[in-house]
Swiss-Prot record:
Keywords: Ribonucleoprotein, Ribosomal protein. The gene is rplS. One of its GO terms (biological process) is translation. Belongs to the bacterial ribosomal protein bL19 family. This is Large ribosomal subunit protein bL19. GO terms for cellular component: cytosolic large ribosomal subunit. It comes from Nostoc sp. (strain PCC 7120 / SAG 25.82 / UTEX 2576). The lineage of its organism: Bacteria, Bacillati, Cyanobacteriota, Cyanophyceae, Nostocales. This protein is located at the 30S-50S ribosomal subunit interface and may play a role in the structure and function of the aminoacyl-tRNA binding site. Pfam families: Ribosomal_L19. One of its GO terms (molecular function) is structural constituent of ribosome. The keyword Ribonucleoprotein applies. The keyword Transmembrane helix does not apply.
Amino acid sequence: MSAQEIIRSIEAEQLKSNLPEIYIGDTVRVGVKIKEGEKYRVQPYEGVVIARRNGGINETITVRRVFQGVGVERVFLLHSPRIDNIKVLRRGKVRRAKLYYLRGRVGKATRIKQRFDRSL
């Protein structure tokens, strides 16, 4: 067994199997585990998926939302133990792999058409 095969087999054990199909342009709600003292709570973060990177254990999505007039982006490792759940709220109809152009837009210009041919 080569080193790469060993690494792949270890990573395969760590992958989450209950992730939904996530596409660019989707509006998602990510439940992030936050530790406060000794307790854990789940904080929801809702926004539009503007980028998706890599594959395997290091797969990430970038989620953007506007909060109090300021654009906020967070990068989430999909297979991280800190991610409690991911729920797709609506499907977006886009023709780009990365939606970085949304960074320069405000208000109604940031809206994305809804896609109905894919199930939630």
